[in-house]
Amino acid sequence: MNKQASQPRAIYYVVALQIWEYFSFYGMRALLILYLTNQLKYDDNHAYELFSAYCSLVYVTPILGGYLADKVLGNRMAVMLGAFLMAIGHLVLGASEIAPTFLYLSLAIIVCGYGLFKSNISCLLGELYQPEDPRRDGGFSLLYAAGNIGSIVAPIACGYVQEEYSWAMGFALAAIGMLAGLVIFLCGNRHFTHTTGVNKAVLCARNYLLPNWGWLLILLVAAPLLITVLFWKEWSVYALIVATAIGLVVLAKIYRQAQTAKQRKELGLIVTLTLFSMLFWAFAQQGGSSISLYIDRFVNRDILGYSVPTAMFQSVNAFAVMLCGVVLAWLVKESVSGNRTVRIWGKFALGLGLMSAGFCILTLSARWSAAYGHSSMPLMVLGLAVMGFAELFIDPVAMSQITRIDIPGVTGVLTGIYMLLSGAIANYLAGVIADQTSQSAFDASGAVNYAINAYVDVFEQITWGALACVGVVLLIWLYQSFKFKSRALAVES
């Protein structure tokens, strides 16, 4: 077998850890909005607010996590520490059923763990390849698709355990999954000796009376407590504003650090891709909030007398990602000709177009509910599957481009900024969108019909919004195609 055509052996341990991280994160996420509304009896407004705050802050911390990995911990140690914290957070969340005061603390611990894990798992994968290695795009697609095995199994397993036993057991299962992934990853340590490790010189250096490892321990204790206060006082939006401002300052600093026109061009491409990713995920993240409650209330979930738990529907788009991702990874590996920038914009246009198509199907489903009281399950499954397929043309493409940039020591921070915009801000926008479906704004006389009409309106607006994004991206694609062909003709002449 051609060694250049096969993936590095270390990728399989990264993929295994990603699978279990997806299991842990998405198992908990599938339960959270339902836990808030059905168990803790939050109204829709309050539940959407806390859910979007959690999903926003979970993407703010990767900036700090990326910085710590770049300067002190290295990607491998940051990933392991993040996985451990997430497991602890899920266990504490299970206790919040008995003591609701643990709710904010548990979410804060998960947020901190996710910050260390999420941006650095992609950077760790990037360390396995040379910058121009043609296997790189295929590796990222494989990571993204295989990781979704966890996303498929988690809502089914955690949803079933919650339904049959308790909410606490459902969250505990998510924690067990994360610990299992960490153990598997540790078994493959020998394959990562060439990756960047802990910077012991920086870690042991003294700053303001304490060595840096002492400040790191203080940070690991103080950060969850601070984030707990943000949840409790509902101040997360202010943290988001501050984080965004810091991210923009850091981005400007990186731009000044770029020494060549090629580096600045690559950085500009990353920024533009990030903005479109932000809009894409503002639409896609309805899956964990408004779409989940829509399914719970207005979709017929009965199969031969068995009512399918709402959480299990979170598996549908993940299954679509896994099913189509392997094929896409093969196509990317084989199709390496042509201009890379043109291919990138073509993929983004396809991803946004599929998202628009998915919400068009959900709009039809909501209209069916408005007319007949409940919508059919197959129509809902089809819409979620199309939306899942769309994801393959957004994140893997953008992350591959970020790890490709030829500016030393910035990939972790750039990944964190990408997570901030396409994750934190996108989730905040998703919360604003989802709040338009909240029942608390409806009067009692026509609550049910009015609620369904709100879902129809929101899903339809997202359909047109995503389609408008497709139009803009296609214009960029046409411009890049024309420029590439003009250069090719100039070279031939």
Curated annotation (Swiss-Prot):
One of its GO terms (cellular component) is plasma membrane. The keyword DNA-binding does not apply. Pfam families: PTR2. The keyword Membrane applies. This is Dipeptide permease D. The gene is dtpD. It is found in: Cell inner membrane. Belongs to the major facilitator superfamily. Proton-dependent oligopeptide transporter (POT/PTR) (TC 2.A.17) family. DtpD subfamily. It comes from the Bacteria. Keywords: Cell inner membrane, Cell membrane, Membrane, Peptide transport, Protein transport, Transmembrane, Transmembrane helix, Transport. The chain crosses the membrane at residues 14-34, 49-69, 91-111, 138-158, 167-187, 212-232, 235-255, 267-287, 312-332, 344-364, 379-399, 413-433, 458-478. GO terms for molecular function: dipeptide transmembrane transporter activity; peptide:proton symporter activity; tripeptide transmembrane transporter activity. Probable proton-dependent permease that transports dipeptides. GO terms for biological process: dipeptide transmembrane transport; protein transport. Gene3D superfamilies: MFS general substrate transporter like domains. InterPro entries: AA/pep_transptr_DtpD (IPR023777), Dipep/tripep_permease (IPR005279), MFS_dom (IPR020846), MFS_trans_sf (IPR036259), MFS_Transporters (IPR050171), POT_fam (IPR000109), PTR2_symporter_CS (IPR018456). It comes from Salmonella typhimurium (strain LT2 / SGSC1412 / ATCC 700720).
